[in-house]
Amino acid sequence: MKMETFLVCLFHNADGLHQQIQEILYLLRMHIYETNLYLKQELSRLIYPNRQLSFVLLMPLSLLRNWDDIEYLTDVVDDKQTLHYAANLLTNYVLHLSMFQKLTKPYFLLAVKRVSEKLNKKQRHSFYEVLVTSETLNNYENLSKNILNTLMFAVRYVFKPTPNYSEILAELEKKNKIHHIIFNMVITDFAQIREQQMDKHLCETNNELRQECKETIFDLKVVGNV
């Protein structure tokens, strides 16, 4: 998946942002050839007053340039709403990069940890609280695999200290049974995931849901092995 395609998909429901997105994509392509200072000036012009866009810029900018500007873009945003938005958006982005471009874990972990640390330090909200909020799940209700992959990624690689799994599971169970089932499996070792376990958990569900579960577990294994 191309970066341009993914960014546009993220904002398919955002009115009035199309032109800004096109400008951003143009600048990102220029960034390969231009200096960081020039790009900073141009990006600053675009991200205000809508500072949520700063994190759309943070992701590809950091990936293109060895993370030089990551603190600049994270430190300009302090409000809780934008940080929550950024944490979810950023995690989904790096997950897609890991699957489609085969990036190594240390390379994309830094950005997620940076946002997570900022959340914990300034807002006193842990990363998992962001991921299990109703707003986050509702925003991605039609992208169930993205949600599940995000949760798996956060648990396997980001959480420090270890989160309270029971709280996460309880929150997920309220919202969507399939999310709860998959997540419960994910926090165990992948070797323990067997078809008979799925049958036990999904004995009251239909075949279509069972197939979705199998496909999702396959996706999770792929991401987990990046």
Swiss-Prot record:
Plays a role in the inhibition of host NF-kappa-B and IRF3 signaling pathways. Mechanistically, promotes the degradation of host IKBKG through enhancing its ubiquitination leading to inhibition of both pathways. Induction: Expressed in the intermediate phase of the viral replicative cycle (immediately after DNA replication). Transmembrane segments: none annotated. The keyword Signal applies. This is Late protein I226R. It comes from the Viruses. Residues 1-16 form the signal peptide. The keyword Signal applies. GO terms for biological process: symbiont-mediated suppression of host NF-kappaB cascade. Belongs to the asfivirus I226R family. It comes from African swine fever virus (isolate Tick/South Africa/Pretoriuskop Pr4/1996).
